[in-house]
Amino acid sequence: GDALKSDKPVNMLGGGNPARIAEVNAVFADVFSKLAAEHAVENIGNYSNPQGDAALIDALTTFLNREYGWNLTADNIALTNGSQNAFFYLFNLFGGKFKVSDDLSVEKAILLPLAPEYIGYADVHVEGQHFVSVKPKIEAVEHEGEEGFFKYRVDFDALESLPELKEGKIGAICCSRPTNPTGNVLTDGEMARLDALAQEHGIPLII
């Protein structure tokens, strides 16, 4: 945004990568140069399959099956034009207005287990209440022996007693790991409890 155009130093926490590393940027630049020299230019005038690049889909299914022991096929993989596009589809698929009967409909929201969350989620809904969230527990912690640090933790007491969850008004649970812009990382234990909560209510957990 305009803040980045300032002549004063700015730590950009509103989006993108707040910790760009020169050495990593150099690696990316080298890879992009090689791609351009090989076959990227050839693809400029061509459209790929509507499902996405077949080679990438095959690579993803092979990787996920090998790493997690799954039995995926190309039919289980959906490629989108970046994460914003993916969340547009997901949030409007599981959130918004749902018709229960001819005379009855219900609005469902996306549950964010704690806030602050990724600012990019804010503008992807088409209709209905966008989000429901609860305040996190903030725990003072030490880092390498130094005080003055803190960590966000999910307040499961508040989360599990949320009226919208009990009333079936939550379409999905969504969390970022790590979270942008705070860098907070939900623990394995927190993820396991969120998974169990999602299964209990029959809704997806989107990470």
Regions found by a protein language model. Name each.
Residues E42-I206:
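Conserved core of the PLP fold type I
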Residues G1-A55, T62, R66:
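N-terminal "arm"/small-domain region of PLP-dependent enzymes with the aminotransferase-like
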